[in-house]
């Protein structure tokens, strides 16, 4: 639904607001007949997971210095986290075929948030490796469960819009993560973003 308006003269220029949509109406158009609330929750989970990953990437030099790591040690940590995420994705995808995907998504979000928070409390390299590997649960749960939930909830004719909106969360998280992480780390230290995100 568009806002009806007449062209207006502003500063010598004609403007027309007839193409401006209310944000809720735009979201409703994306969701179509599917559950808007569910789509927004999955969008939020996807964005926050990306915030965490991009925060770790932007704060890697501070983390490296805190734990006296070289570049090789830091890259080993990052590769270990990626390998754990890949291994977990296969296991979680199998679980999602047999069990409630909503419950798996909730459990994954809770586990991810606990591990992400604990990243800010890490006192040793081994502990940091364990909690960062545990935080890989977020990505491992998001891909198999979110995709199948969206496919179940939305009809084929609206899936392109829905999946595009859901994937936009990655760009939102990747864009806002470094910004917020940088500001928080500058003010409070590298641990703060993980305690807040």
Where are these regions (language model features)?
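Residue-level signature of mid-helix packing/kink "hotspots" within the transmembrane helices
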Residues: 54, 82-90, 174-175
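Extracytoplasmic
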Residues: 38-69
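Conserved MFS/SLC helix-loop-helix module at the cytosolic interface between two early adjacent transmembrane helices
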Residues: 87-123
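Cytoplasmic helix-loop-helix junction between adjacent transmembrane helices
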Residues: 131-171
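Interfacial helix-cap and linker-helix signal at transmembrane-aqueous boundaries
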Residues: 63-64, 95-96, 183-188
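Helix-loop-helix hairpin linking two adjacent transmembrane segments in secondary transporters
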Residues: 166, 170-197
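Extracellular/periplasmic helix-loop-helix junction of adjacent transmembrane segments
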Residues: 59-86
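Helix-breaking motifs and short loop linkers at transmembrane-helix boundaries and internal kinks
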Residues: 68, 100, 121-127, 138, ...
């Amino acid at each position: 639904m568009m806002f009806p308006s007449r062209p207006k003269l502003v500063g010598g220029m004609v403007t027309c607001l007839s193409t401006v949509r209310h944000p809720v109406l735009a979201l409703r158009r994306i969701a179509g007949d599917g559950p808007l609330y569910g789509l927004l929750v999955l969008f939020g989970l996807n964005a926050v997971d990306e915030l965490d990953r991009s925060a770790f990437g932007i704060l890697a030099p501070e983390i490296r210095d805190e734990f006296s790591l070289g570049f090789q040690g830091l890259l080993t940590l990052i590769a270990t986290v990626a390998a754990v995420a890949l291994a977990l994705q296969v296991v979680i995808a199998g679980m999602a075929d047999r069990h409630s995907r909503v419950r798996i998504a909730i459990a994954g979000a809770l586990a991810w948030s606990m591990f992400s928070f604990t990243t800010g409390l890490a006192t040793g390299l081994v502990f940091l490796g364990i909690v960062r590997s545990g935080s890989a649960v977020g990505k491992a749960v998001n891909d198999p469960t979110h995709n199948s939930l969206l496919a179940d909830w939305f009809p084929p004719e609206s899936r392109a819009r829905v999946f595009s909106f859901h994937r936009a969360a990655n760009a939102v998280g990747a864009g806002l993560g470094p910004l917020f992480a940088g500001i928080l780390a500058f003010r409070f230290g590298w641990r703060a973003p993980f305690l807040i995100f």
